Amino acid sequence: VITSLLRATDCDMKTAIPRMQNYFEFYVEIFGALSFKQSLTNDSELREMVESGIVHVFENCDAKGRCMRVMQYNQIRTGLNSDALQITKMFHYVTMRTLKNYPMTQKNGFMDVCDMGGLSLENFSLRITRSNLLMSSRFLPCKVHKICVLRPLYFMKFLLRAVKPYAFPGPMARHFLILSQDPKDLLKDPVFCR
């Protein structure tokens, strides 16, 4: 965790130390103790969430070796896998495994794609969206290079524009793209994939 955070912040201790404190506080709040270790073999709920298809990771998606996390909101089903805490734990597990397996992602960051296509209002949870944004921007020991929101629900277009300066202050907000149903939007440089 510490190595990943130092790489993500380019060894800037002024940035790394508060982020490290935030991560450890977040970890204790979610898992109860720093000594707790997530494992698919011991946690059937976590395994079920990982296998649910909500989050997919694609490695080495650009010339700098960044990984892409694709979150498909239409895979979240009310009552089945919609518990915000379980989704947070699953997102943490997937992110930490990716950082461990792909050191270039530690340094160069993730590209996140949030696909809301096929999502209905009854399955939408602002809490899940907000917790994932905050977790990526404030707590996890990683850098987010670019975020693309594909096919957002109509009201989300306005909500995300208001939230992005708060969730990603400074220059990061430039890399937060909201793409509509129009395929031409994909040509507006959302992600450089090989």
Regions found by a protein language model. Give the residues of each.
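Acidic, metal-coordinating catalytic cores used for nucleic-acid/nucleotide bond scission
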Residues: 118-122, 151-156
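Contiguous terminal or domain-adjacent regions
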Residues: 1, 153-194
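Short coil/turn segments at secondary-structure boundaries
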Residues: 18, 82, 125-128, 160-163
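Short aromatic-glycine motifs in intrinsically disordered, low-complexity regions
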Residues: 129-139
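Extracytoplasmic/secreted proteins and extracellular or luminal domains
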Residues: 139-140, 168
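Aromatic/basic-lined ligand-recognition segments
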Residues: 1-120
